[in-house]
Regions:
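Secretory pathway targeting signatures of secreted, lumenal, and periplasmic proteins
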Residues: 2-56, 60
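Loop/helix-junction capping segments adjacent to catalytic residues or to phosphate/diphosphate-binding pockets
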Residues: 52, 94, 119-123
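Short, charged low-complexity linear motifs
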Residues: 1-4, 108, 122
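General beta-strand recognition
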Residues: 9, 29, 84-85, 111-112
């Protein structure tokens, strides 16, 4: 499937559900959910937003929900575009989970990508999440 609205374009799997959200502060977000509960989200923040602050705030929010949270600073390079971020590991209901946050600053916006899945699904879905980010950056 293809999402192409509000200046944002990316591809996602046919059987995933999509939901849009606009906050009062003008931030715009999209969440794409897999049937098994895994999800990928993209949020558009104003240009010049502090990426490291957004990454840290994501970690702080997760730590508030999951005290055993492990955080690993990471970055990706896709088509020569650098994305800063972090990987997270935590337990929930006796299941281990992995999540990633990546930030992309452009002249027009700061984009935050967040994805999460149970570890038993992560090895399969990690490639889907990466393809979604790649399709977003390619545009």
């Amino acid at each position: 499937m293809e999402f192409n609205r509000n200046g944002i374009h990316f591809e996602y799997p046919d059987n995933w559900a999509i939901e849009e959200d606009t906050s009062p502060d003008g931030a715009y977000g999209i969440t794409v959910s897999a049937p098994d509960g895994a999800f990928w989200s993209l949020s558009r923040q104003p240009p010049g937003a502090d990426s490291q602050h957004l990454i840290d705030a994501t970690g702080d929010q997760l730590r508030g929900e999951y005290p055993d949270l492990e955080v690993y600073p990471r970055s990706d390079d896709i088509f020569g575009t650098s994305l800063s971020g972090a990987d997270f590991n935590f337990s929930y209901l006796d299941l281990t989970n992995t999540a990633e946050v990546r930030c992309l600053n452009t002249p027009t916006a700061c984009y935050i990508v967040f994805c999460q899945a149970e570890d038993r699904d992560w090895s399969r879905l990690h490639h889907v999440f990466k393809a979604m980010v790649t399709s977003f950056i390619r545009e």
